[in-house]
């Protein structure tokens, strides 16, 4: 996929950079693989904001993605590559030999007409899904399971992938894009290749309104608030906050480590950079 630049006939077009989607499917998604999705506005079941700066945005249908790839030893053909408003990666509609349809995350270089399969005997080919114990070291992977049968959780965002760097004592060692080395059970499944749409990181929305279409509201700085709203608020004139950066609740931010899951720390061989 290439990037699109625009002639600056309006101010918002001057900086706009978008991913060229001309090769994607232009129709509607397969109705049987979609469902409605309700907006939360960043609120939880008590009506309190738990995710700030969310709200509004264009109405969307949720595409049901097969992260588990549980249809074993049944080949499927790629019918089309589609845009998905719920994620940064593109998705592929595949049709199995028994007639069933499914959506999967589209890896780079997967084309219409290609065949994919989930099997321990599958070839090491883009889009095929295998248990890690049958994948050779050095292979680039995406949609990697962390728990057997739970479905892929690692490397699902646009352009991402992990590298299989070793196998030992029932675990595979994978290298994440963050620089982290992690252990994953060898019976967990992963898909060959890296995720589509690697140019997502180079886009420029061009104007605030386009962010609103995506469901993001304005991010107000703490120093622009009143003292009642934020520890950085208040002061005469424009002040810098007068203390080290903190959250609205007074906890250190901007680099403070927040990970607290000691139970799974034993699976992290090397921490992220």
From Swiss-Prot:
<comment type="function">
    <text>One of the primary rRNA binding proteins. Required for association of the 30S and 50S subunits to form the 70S ribosome, for tRNA binding and peptide bond formation. It has been suggested to have peptidyltransferase activity; this is somewhat controversial. Makes several contacts with the 16S rRNA in the 70S ribosome.</text>
</comment>
<dbReference type="InterPro" id="IPR022671">
    <property type="entry name" value="Ribosomal_uL2_CS"/>
</dbReference>
<keyword id="KW-0699">rRNA-binding</keyword>
<dbReference type="GO" id="GO:0003735">
    <property type="term" value="F:structural constituent of ribosome"/>
</dbReference>
<dbReference type="InterPro" id="IPR014726">
    <property type="entry name" value="Ribosomal_uL2_dom3"/>
</dbReference>
<dbReference type="Pfam" id="PF00181">
    <property type="entry name" value="Ribosomal_L2"/>
</dbReference>
<dbReference type="GO" id="GO:0006412">
    <property type="term" value="P:translation"/>
</dbReference>
<keyword id="KW-0689">Ribosomal protein</keyword>
<feature type="region of interest" description="Disordered">
    <location>
        <begin position="228"/>
        <end position="273"/>
    </location>
</feature>
<dbReference type="InterPro" id="IPR014722">
    <property type="entry name" value="Rib_uL2_dom2"/>
</dbReference>
<protein>
    <recommendedName>
        <fullName>Large ribosomal subunit protein uL2</fullName>
    </recommendedName>
</protein>
<dbReference type="GO" id="GO:0016740">
    <property type="term" value="F:transferase activity"/>
</dbReference>
<dbReference type="Pfam" id="PF03947">
    <property type="entry name" value="Ribosomal_L2_C"/>
</dbReference>
<dbReference type="GO" id="GO:0015934">
    <property type="term" value="C:large ribosomal subunit"/>
</dbReference>
<keyword id="KW-0694">RNA-binding</keyword>
<dbReference type="InterPro" id="IPR022669">
    <property type="entry name" value="Ribosomal_uL2_C"/>
</dbReference>
<comment type="subunit">
    <text>Part of the 50S ribosomal subunit. Forms a bridge to the 30S subunit in the 70S ribosome.</text>
</comment>
<dbReference type="InterPro" id="IPR002171">
    <property type="entry name" value="Ribosomal_uL2"/>
</dbReference>
<dbReference type="InterPro" id="IPR012340">
    <property type="entry name" value="NA-bd_OB-fold"/>
</dbReference>
<comment type="similarity">
    <text>Belongs to the universal ribosomal protein uL2 family.</text>
</comment>
<dbReference type="InterPro" id="IPR005880">
    <property type="entry name" value="Ribosomal_uL2_bac/org-type"/>
</dbReference>
<keyword id="KW-0687">Ribonucleoprotein</keyword>
<dbReference type="InterPro" id="IPR022666">
    <property type="entry name" value="Ribosomal_uL2_RNA-bd_dom"/>
</dbReference>
<dbReference type="InterPro" id="IPR008991">
    <property type="entry name" value="Translation_prot_SH3-like_sf"/>
</dbReference>
<dbReference type="GO" id="GO:0019843">
    <property type="term" value="F:rRNA binding"/>
</dbReference>
<feature type="compositionally biased region" description="Basic residues">
    <location>
        <begin position="254"/>
        <end position="273"/>
    </location>
</feature>
